[in-house]
């Protein structure tokens, strides 16, 4: 199963999946990507 959550530390619109993934990894998640019409950074990991 994959868990997803909005990044707590990512600021502004998400334009780069790479930047989002780096922020998520610093928060202890496996990675992340830009998602949805508002381009939020969503963190993902196995759970």
From Swiss-Prot:
Cystine pairings recorded for this chain: 3-47, 14-34, 20-41, 24-43
Record's keyword annotation contains Protein biosynthesis: no
InterPro entries: Defensin_plant (IPR008176), Scorpion_toxin-like (IPR003614), Scorpion_toxin-like_sf (IPR036574)
Chain positions of site Interaction with trypsin: 11
Domain of life: Eukaryota
Keywords per UniProt: Antimicrobial, Disulfide bond, Fungicide, Plant defense
GO biological process, one term: defense response to fungus
Pfam families (alphabetical): Gamma-thionin (PF00304)
PROSITE patterns: GAMMA_THIONIN
Family indicated by similarity: Belongs to the DEFL family.
Stated role: Inhibits protein translation in cell-free systems.
Protein name per Swiss-Prot or TrEMBL: Defensin-like protein 1
Originating species: Triticum aestivum (Wheat)
């Amino acid at each position: 199963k994959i868990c997803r959550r909005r990044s707590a530390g990512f600021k502004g619109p998400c334009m780069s999946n790479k930047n989002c993934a780096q922020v998520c990894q610093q928060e202890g998640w496996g990675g992340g990507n830009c998602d949805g019409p508002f381009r939020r950074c969503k963190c993902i990991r196995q759970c």
